[in-house]
Amino acid sequence: MDTVARVGLVRDASRAFNQRRVEDLLAVMVADVEWPDIAGGTVLRSHDEVRAYWLAQFETARPVVEPTDFVAAGDDLVAVVRQQVFDHAGTPLTDAVTVYHRYTFRGEKVAAMTVHADRSAALA
């Protein structure tokens, strides 16, 4: 999969996330995906774990991610992401922040994602 296809996949996945289409998100991930649970300080390692994490998160808040730029990092892809969390009425719970999501791929699917506060760490 080339960089253009990877960018398209991440953009589509971000839209699915913002629309709470969990099964569409899981469809672009390998079965043993590694996904960060930032609040819990752990790494989730399966579709079932990621699904449960997102469904619990969506019950309490409405996180929104907007990828604004992409940088190839070897075989990985780093997305510059504007992120903000809202309540279900649309009131912001957090200020918008910029974070960096680094995606690793296996074949045409996401194998892992990590979150970084700064660009240099994401590209390292």
Give residue spans per PLM region.
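A solvent-exposed, acidic/Ser-Thr-rich amphipathic alpha-helical stretch
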Residues: 22-74
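A beta-strand edge to alpha-helix "cap/lid" segment located at domain peripheries
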Residues: 1-5, 51-124
